[in-house]
Amino acid sequence: MNSESLENLHRPLIESSKSFVDYRLETVLTDRELPYFRRIYLAMMIEMKFLFHLAAPAIFVYVINNGMSILTRIFAGHVGSFELAAASLGNSGFNMFTYGLLLGMGSAVETLCGQAHGAHRYEMLGVYLQRSTVVLILTCLPMSFLFLFSNPILTALGEPEQVATLASVFVYGMIPVIFAYAVNFPIQKFLQSQSIVTPSAYISAATLVIHLILSWIAVYRLGYGLLALSLIHSFSWWIIVVAQIVYIKMSPRCRRTWEGFSWKAFEGLWDFFRLSAASAVMLCLESWYSQILVLLAGLLKNPELALDSLAICMSISAISFMVSVGFNAAASVRVSNELGAGNPRAAAFSTVVTTGVSFLLSVFEAIVVLSWRHVISYAFTDSPAVAEAVADLSPFLAITIVLNGIQPVLSGVAVGCGWQAFVAYVNIGCYYVVGIPVGFVLGFTYDMGAKGIWTGMIGGTLMQTIILVIVTLRTDWDKEVEKASSRLDQWEESREPLLKQ
């Protein structure tokens, strides 16, 4: 073992097309003949190869896809300040609502496909993909009515009439994108569970260029407004979806996991919906949390300034968050694959390494934000008042970025293990019982404004992060391996619920 370890590290990361699990990591971690620090060094070398093979393209994909939303808001801001506020409100109140819900439901595929792939049950991946897509599309049908009635909903919530009217126009053009999400997220998780992430990165990069060109033409050449920008956003997402479908059909890498359309996709839809709902609750409670901050800001004094400054801060936070979400995807894939393959120590080690790297990057990002706090808003608007407000909120933004370097990664570990139901309860308590009420009291009762709202919400995030750290440190990884095997057996036999508290 000692003489071969270094040589093994220079072999290809993935030696066999049968599995994306490297059994050398588990072997190194269990080799007691190696000195402790030598064992950790060799394990780090193996895991870092895996981590950046998965995380780097995933981060790129998430940043690029989120970049389309940010570009849409930037162009809206150059149309007018009310248009920026309306686009931000429409995006936060409706688009991100559906984005979080459907992405959360899609994470059911992440758990099942990841563990099935690690266990070499390749034929089930395509079935899980199709079932999830059917369930998500059916979910989109009633959700589209929320978009159609966005104007009266926003007015009933107390948003200013002019902003609510403009926001509803923006939201109408976003209706096609929710169906794109319903197809994209299962595909995304299907590919990620097989460590296929680079093709999606190329597709997203090409789409971003198309999105930028079309948005520029719409605003500066044709003089169109919010509706055109939101329709272009929807069109861009459908480009991504179609390109990924073509890749799955044509690529030899998906030959064993995609065997064509199957009637099995329509079997057990209710059970799969329940599984997806448990996954959705966990992620939605996280995704909607920051959006509630923007909605509450619309009720403050001078709501236009509050919305503009918070929208810019949330856009910056979203860019940083996408980096953490890339590590979230890597953690989920690594943990689910290793658990499915029966490698408990490798799963635990991957959790530690991924969380540590993500945290260090988030600290660097927070320092950059604080250094550029007086100029960073000018990428979105020319208003000096908004720039001053953004600079004033930058310390809160920096703290949020650091916390987001830890929490999403641990959520990815939870998805890989199938802990979605448990984390959902944690999120309810920390976010909605503690964070939002405290933020509301500080923001409105004590008249601290956006700072008060954000302070309470940071407290909720901190509490949730601490709980997830404690739970992860106390995890019995051998038992998690047993649960992963049992979960796959239960799903194939359709005997018991997949996710237990």
From Swiss-Prot:
InterPro entries: MATE_euk (IPR045069), MATE_fam (IPR002528). Keywords: Membrane, Transmembrane, Transmembrane helix, Transport. It is a multi-pass membrane protein. Pfam families: MatE. Its main location: membrane. GO terms for molecular function: antiporter activity; xenobiotic transmembrane transporter activity. The keyword Transmembrane helix applies. GO terms for cellular component: membrane. The chain crosses the membrane at residues 44-64, 84-104, 134-154, 163-183, 200-220, 222-242, 280-300, 310-330, 352-372, 396-416, 422-442, 453-473. It is found in: Membrane. It comes from the Eukaryota. One of its GO terms (biological process) is xenobiotic detoxification by transmembrane export across the plasma membrane. Belongs to the multi antimicrobial extrusion (MATE) (TC 2.A.66.1) family. This is Protein DETOXIFICATION 37. The gene is DTX37.
